[in-house]
């Protein structure tokens, strides 16, 4: 049921997941380092565009993501036009025994229909200010499509690189003329090797 007769995914959620984390062919000359990388959807279409938009949301949250019908401006939560819709808080707590500053952005009561990012919590290592983990809660109903997604990302150090260690996704979405898709997964990434 996951694949059609030609080996393609029947589900868009599975196709996006596979496109983000797996490759069908060997990949040469790519370092996969996102630090300093400028994400852009320019010249992209279809699934490639949507994969890049997801990368933008994962690695550069709070920025405007072009090309998302009705919600592009609603992802830029730190812009003046959106910031008044949120309560922002800084706290200090341990995360997996690491002392962290915890930055939480949560939608204000009554503003839920004006936003896409309902809540985002980021744990920063108190000594290095590197991201230790981030949780996202997203939802929107545009009439012809809707979604509700919760994601968790845990980071780890591999040498001098900060890389995702655990990714959790629990969500559902519906687009006009398509069946509702629900997905729950946990991706545990390991055995990182740096070449070159």
Give residue spans per PLM region:
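Structured extracytoplasmic
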Residues: 1-116, 140, 181-196
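Acidic, serine/threonine-rich low-complexity disordered tracts
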Residues: 92-98, 112, 118, 127-195
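Non-globular disordered terminal and juxtamembrane segments underlying protein topogenesis/assembly
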Residues: 122-124
């Amino acid at each position: 049921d996951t694949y059609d007769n030609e080996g393609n995914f029947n589900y868009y959620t599975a196709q996006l997941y596979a496109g983000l984390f797996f490759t069908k062919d060997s990949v040469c000359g790519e370092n996969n380092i996102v630090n300093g990388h400028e994400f852009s959807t320019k010249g992209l279409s279809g699934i490639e565009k949507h994969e890049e938009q997801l990368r933008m949301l994962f690695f550069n949250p709070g920025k405007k993501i072009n090309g998302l019908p009705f919600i592009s401006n609603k992802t830029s939560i730190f812009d003046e036009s959106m910031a008044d819709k949120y309560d922002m808080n800084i706290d200090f707590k341990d995360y997996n025994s690491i002392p962290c500053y915890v930055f939480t952005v949560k939608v204000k009561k009554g503003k839920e229909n004006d936003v896409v990012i309902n809540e985002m919590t980021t744990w920063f290592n108190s000594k290095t200010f590197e991201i230790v983990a981030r949780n996202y809660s997203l939802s929107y109903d545009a009439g012809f499509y809707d979604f509700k997604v919760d994601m968790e990302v845990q980071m780890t150090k591999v040498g001098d690189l900060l890389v995702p260690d655990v990714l959790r996704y629990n969500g559902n979405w519906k687009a006009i003329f398509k069946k509702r898709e629900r997905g729950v997964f946990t991706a545990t990434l390991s055995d990182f090797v740096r070449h070159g």
